[in-house]
């Protein structure tokens, strides 16, 4: 089994599918799914490749993932070619090994074993795969979700294969994620010579008190599932590097990660009220990434915990920490959503790698979840 998983992972890693490119990864996966009786619906949008695969009827268990990867960074910093996967000391190295081509290989091989053992399984087993998760995420999973909702074709349970684990596979699972919204604020002034400040209007001087007020906003205190919402500066810029020029504008980008205690509209009003209450000329652009979502204890979480405990003899920690994931789109369908994947300590880094034994363990967990929900 390990060889089968590893070989599939290596095939996928060897394809330089930097987001949103797929470059043939999905063709490999689709071929294997077709061989075990899955129907395929491609939902391609612009440069993004998406597909929905399903087998059976009834309550639907979906495995969701992505074939795209982030850029490699500096090639010279890698010990090996990031798109020529190699095995060293029990680890598989390559871009996407942990995030998340290794998990894709674990899913597919788990499905192959499950279907072989239970060809007439109850319910429906499905896959939702995209090549637009790591970049804009506008043409990816959300488009498949919209397609399914237009057909009134709903997902009941979903396992997202994002690398949720911290030290060992299954020690942490994500049963929700915070929402995310970005505010791009430009404070406009009047450029001038720094020796004649009375002839200019310094946007930095006017902007700093406003920035501090925004950072001091307390949106909420969190709840049983989420930490308190946070406001952080992601980027700030003014001036052109000359020490004798007052800049004409100041740009500051805030990112807000928010809990289920507040809405994006409340966040927007809080920030806009501060801007309007100060004597500044500003413009603002909002980028909304997704609402918070939470899956409370139910059949899916109970099943995932049961499978993890079977292999690890220890229950996982339920967490909503970290960034956004495509689970936020699937949750719009009212689905129970849990993220269970590989260890995340090398994701997006140079020399990304995953233990071969972890690939096997994750695939076994996935198969056990299929068996417990569908057999």
UniProtKB/Swiss-Prot annotation:
The active site is at residues 68, 133. It catalyses: N-succinyl-(2S,6S)-2,6-diaminopimelate + H2O = (2S,6S)-2,6-diaminopimelate + succinate. It is an enzyme of class 3 (hydrolase). GO terms for molecular function: acetylornithine deacetylase activity; cobalt ion binding; succinyl-diaminopimelate desuccinylase activity; zinc ion binding. Zn(2+) 1 binds at residues 66, 99, 162. The keyword Electron transport does not apply. CDD domains: M20_DapE_proteobac (cd03891). It comes from the Bacteria. Zn(2+) 2 binds at residues 99, 134, 348. Binds 2 Zn(2+) or Co(2+) ions per subunit. Its EC number is 3.5.1.18. InterPro entries: ArgE/DapE_CS, Bact_exopeptidase_dim_dom, DapE_proteobac, Peptidase_M20, Peptidase_M20_dimer, Peptidase_M20A. Gene3D superfamilies: Zn peptidases (3.40.630.10). GO terms for biological process: diaminopimelate biosynthetic process; L-arginine biosynthetic process; lysine biosynthetic process via diaminopimelate. Keywords: Amino-acid biosynthesis, Cobalt, Diaminopimelate biosynthesis, Hydrolase, Lysine biosynthesis, Metal-binding, Zinc. Pathway: Amino-acid biosynthesis; L-lysine biosynthesis via DAP pathway; LL-2,6-diaminopimelate from (S)-tetrahydrodipicolinate (succinylase route): step 3/3. The keyword Zinc applies. Its cofactor is Zn(2+); Co(2+). Homodimer. Belongs to the peptidase M20A family. DapE subfamily. Catalyzes the hydrolysis of N-succinyl-L,L-diaminopimelic acid (SDAP), forming succinate and LL-2,6-diaminopimelate (DAP), an intermediate involved in the bacterial biosynthesis of lysine and meso-diaminopimelic acid, an essential component of bacterial cell walls. This is Succinyl-diaminopimelate desuccinylase.
